Design a protein with these regions (language model features):
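Conserved phosphate-binding elements of NTP-dependent enzyme cores
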Residues: 1-939
Length: 939
């Protein structure tokens, strides 16, 4: 078998027709500057071709249900194995997905509880034992005399299928009636069931009237039912509540029966286990009054109510018509702060009133007076949410919603019968609420009887193995019940990595995208050991990574570069780490060997002497902490994964400031008080989300330089002669754009069983504009030519137009000189998108009162890119602004003016402030993991 993956002529995106050989069954790291072509080679070429080959082996019918897979632009790839991609995308936004379900641990837990779980009475918590037929007969006979009942034998419960044989067998056995999905059918008629729907089938064994002398017949009928159903009987009480009895489990005191324990009883995604009140979600979403009225010190006239459609306060608005009617009816002033209004009146504004109010109709609606009820702002939003078919409207209203626990199951998702089954004294919900670390310890110390051990040995082995894998990738602080949608990209990737190890596949090509993201240096060694274990199983690992420790641990390194974008796309180096350290042409080698370094600042900023102070922060695992954030400094919030950094910065500080300064509709996490907001004028969160989701979004439109370029073209003599305004040069509006492709430059061609093809528009040849618009030139270049220029070329071209040159130079300063001015947003990496946002902030006039918040800005960045990023962040802080960063990268941490270190551990073991101060002060703290790893970087 070939021992290499041989790639010839790879040209995807910016790759320059490269040839490369990668050893199989090795731990291979691909590195290079952001935008150099690493992902283009690893994901868009190698993985894409592996997936495409697999999909082409399937039938056309199967391919119809799978996503499209384009053939990458490469001549050939030999030696390719089946490929599995583990990228940074969040696992699932489905509220039913949890850490337990994604890792399959929850499936094993359900099986464990079904096999060795001990049922208890949901009322008295007494351990439940089996019921005898005599006990069941006595309880049925206790029904009121004259009550009509039917004895039903369940033969199918909530399963898909047609069940023709079962129905035929019932007919031949002499039964006359059957209840299917709640409807009674005569067995003599032809019954056809939908095989794709779940059905419940119950045979009507007997029909009785409760009276003296029926015990003998009832006993015989129950024995018949139990012989058919396996110990379960459903008593259909005519005009009464249905009863279920089991020979298996029942509480003698409260007559509560529990069906035979099965895995589906413990599934919140199955109606047989899910809480019927919340259908297994554990929470309800509702309009939150605190989001509708975020600042209760404002009056109605000052805009206390922020809801969509209810915040227009002009005299002629419909909202003001309603508000005035309420004020007149209840004798209040619309200038009174909302918090000072009587509670009854506050509720009228929010929830409406059945009392008829006098509305003075505005002139535009015909004038006059009308009498009617007011449904209330919250009720109005809920009605609009249910009735609207517009995703935009629904998303807008969802921004006013928050979640509350289901009052029935208290957020546990399961029905009370399922929650009354325990193993080791804990029900399944209590067990999944433990952290992975505590759950692992629970199974280490679990005392079972000899019989229970025999039954559960293999199940517990699988559970412990999977919990161990999660511990080894640094996720021991997560709860198994944690919603998958709340995980960061790095966390979800490491969960999938742990799941893959659990599957024990061999001969597979795994492609990973920066698995170290979000991981503290302390946990990095465990992650590297996990990846090596995956390799030792007989797999090939290709890891796109910038982390020094990961590169040093690799068997083979491929360095793509030398620059980024048009300056990248070549293989600068391919070989072992030892050879890379000696390679003078590799920027990676320069930083890894220490030939180049990010310097430690000679002195730290003193700040402006003012503070943003947070008191009593208690969101998630934060333990009622107080923290002072010095303003006018570059600040890093550090700590191991799960220590509470995001809870403090993103959930509390950012959301509170966004509401206070930017009038955002967000609900901040739990805290008592935040002071010092008056020292700030705005908060800006600079993340790695795309700058736009369509090809029409690009760096020029995002930074605003495109507006200046369009205005410049409108001032040319050609444009003036034709009467063109700046709008003529927009590809988002009719007039100047090519209407064949509506300004996209490409047209989608559907190929049905083959992938859709995106072809350049035949009319404009991909230039986006019509012929007349492209005839307008500035210095010999059309608007399309300008958009095709790199930023570096643009700076030279517009050097005499300061307004344009200044904005383009800020893109240069953040290291984006290689990207095209009009490069589609969809082709920018996360790091590139973040730097476009940073450049936009740099181009604005500094007020010195802005706080910038960045969550791991080094994601996807090479050491050389990190160097440039630090210079940009320092410029923002030099202008008197505050820069607050959540970061694990020690090169960033060492240049900070102030560090807030949380810990000591993750999850329940975190949420406290270990130490605050300069990097030099942090390294003196013996309890700080950050301090230990930071020390060598300051020497």
């Amino acid at each position: 078998m070939i021992d290499k993956i041989i790639i010839k002529g790879a040209r995807e995106h910016n790759l320059k027709d490269i040839d490369l050989e990668i050893p199989r069954d090795k731990f291979v790291v691909m590195t290079g500057l952001s935008g150099s072509g690493k992902s283009s080679l690893a994901f868009d070429t190698i993985y894409a071709d592996g997936q495409r080959r697999y999909m082409e082996s399937l039938s056309s019918y199967a391919r119809m249900f799978l996503g499209q897979m384009e053939k990458p632009d490469v001549d050939s790839i030999d030696g390719l194995s089946p490929a599995i991609s583990i990228d940074q995308k969040t696992t699932s936004k489905n509220p039913r997905s949890t850490v337990g379900t994604v890792t399959e641990i929850y499936d094993y837990l359900r099986l464990l509880y079904a096999r060795i779980g001990i049922p208890h009475c949901p009322v008295c918590n007494r351990e439940i034992t089996q019921q005898t037929i005599d006990q069941i007969v006595d309880q049925i006979c206790d029904l009121e005399s004259g009550t009509k009942i039917q004895l039903l034998a369940p033969i199918v419960r909530g399963r898909k299928g047609k069940y023709t044989k079962e129905l035929e067998h019932a007919r031949k056995s002499g039964y006359v009636r059957v209840r299917i999905d709640g409807i009674i059918y005569d067995l003599s008629e032809e019954i056809t069931l939908d095989k794709n729907k779940k059905h419940t089938i119950e045979i009507v064994v007997d029909r009785l009237v409760i009276k003296e002398g029926i015990k003998s017949r009832l006993t015989d009928s129950l024995e018949t039912v139990f012989s058919i159903s396996g110990g379960i009987v459903t008593i259909d009480v005519i005009d009464g509540e249905e009863l279920t009895f089991s020979q298996n489990y029942a509480c003698p005191e409260h007559n509560i029966s529990i069906e035979e324990l099965t895995p589906r009883m413990f599934s919140f995604n199955n109606p047989f286990g899910a809480c019927p009140h919340c259908t297994g979600l554990g929470v309800f979403r509702h309009i939150d009054p605190d989001i509708i009225v975020p600042n209760k010190n404002l009056s109605i006239r000052e805009g206390a109510i922020k809801a969509s459609g209810w915040n227009t306060l002009d005299k002629g608005s419909v909202a003001m018509m309603y508000y005035t009617a309420i004020a007149n009816e209840y004798g209040i002033s619309l200038d009174t702060p909302f918090c000072e209004l009587p509670e009854e009146v506050q509720n009228v504004f929010l929830y409406g009133t059945d009392q008829k109010l006098e509305f003075k109709i505005i002139e535009s609606f015909g004038g006059g007076v009308r009498y009617g009820k007011f449904e209330g702002v919250i009720n109005n939003l809920e009605r609009r949410y249910k009735e609207s078919n517009s995703s935009y409207s629904r998303n807008e209203i969802e921004s006013y919603m928050s979640e509350t626990l289901c009052p029935e199951c208290k957020g546990n998702r399961l029905k009370k019968e399922s929650l009354s089954v325990t193993v080791g004294g804990l029900n399944i919900s209590q067990l999944t609420a433990l952290s992975v670390r505590d759950c692992f310890d629970f199974f280490e110390n679990l005392n079972l009887t000899e019989r229970q051990q025999f039954i559960s040995r293999q199940i517990i082995k699988e559970i412990r193995e999977r919990l161990g894998f999660l511990k080894n990738v640094g996720l021991d602080y997560l709860n198994l019940s944690r919603s998958a949608g709340t995980l960061s990209g790095g966390e979800s990737q490491r969960i999938r990595l742990a799941t893959q190890i659990g599957s024990s596949l061999t001969g597979v090509l795994y492609i990973l995208d920066e698995p170290s993201i979000g991981l503290h240096q302390r946990d990095n060694d465990k992650l590297i050991a996990t990846m090596k274990r995956l390799r030792d199983l007989g797999n090939t690992l290709i890891v796109v990574e910038h982390d020094d420790d990961t590169m040093l641990a690799a068997d083979y390194i491929v360095d793509i570069g030398p620059g980024a974008g048009v300056n990248g796309g070549n293989v600068v180096f391919a070989g072992t780490v030892d050879k890379l350290l000696k390679c003078k042409n590799s920027v990676t080698g320069d930083y890894l060997s220490g030939r180049k370094k990010i310097p430690v600042p000679a002195k730290r900023r003193k700040g402006n002497g003012k503070f943003l102070s947070v008191k009593g922060a208690s969101e998630h695992n934060l333990k009622n902490i107080n923290v002072d954030i010095p303003l006018g400094k570059l600040i890093c919030v550090t700590g191991v994964s799960g220590s509470g950094k995001s809870s403090l910065v993103n959930e509390i500080i950012y959301k509170h400031l966004a509401c206070k300064l930017n009038r955002a509709k967000l609900k901040a996490g739990n805290f008592k008080e935040i002071t010092g907001c008056e020292h700030l004028d705005k908060v800006i969160n600079i993340d790695q989300s795309p700058i736009g989701r369509t090809p029409r979004s690009n760096p020029a439109t995002y930074t605003g330089v495109f507006t200046d370029i369009r205005e410049l073209f409108a001032q040319t003599s050609d444009a003036k002669a034709r009467g063109y305004s700046s709008g003529r040069f927009s590809f988002n509006t009719k007039g100047g754009r090519c209407e064949a492709c509506e300004g996209d430059g490409i047209i989608k061609i559907e190929m049905h069983f083959l992938p859709d093809i995106y072809a350049p528009c035949e009319v404009c040849k991909g230039k986006r504009y019509n012929r007349e618009t492209l005839e307008v030139h500035y210095k010999g270049k059309s608007i399309h030519d300008v958009l095709e220029m790199t930023v570096d070329e643009g700076v030279q071209f517009f050097e005499h137009i300061p307004k344009i040159a200044r904005k383009l130079k800020t893109l240069q300063e953040v290291g984006l000189g290689y990207i095209k001015i009009g490069q589609p947003a969809t082709t920018l990496s996360g790091g590139e998108a973040q730097r476009v946002k940073l450049s936009t902030e740099l181009s604005k006039r500094a007020t010195g009162k802005t706080i910038y918040i960045l969550d791991e800005p080094t994601t996807g960045l090479h050491n050389a890119d990190v160097h440039k990023l630090i210079e940009v962040l320092q410029k923002l802080a030099d202008s008197g602004n505050t820069v607050l960063i959540i970061e694990h990268n020690l090169n960033v941490i060492k240049v900070a003016d102030h560090i807030i270190d949380l810990g000591k551990e993750g999850g329940d073991g975190g949420g406290e402030i270990l130490v605050c101060g300069t990097p030099e002060e942090i390294v003196k703290c013996e309890d700080s993991y950050t301090g230990r790893y930071l020390k060598p970087y300051l020497e």
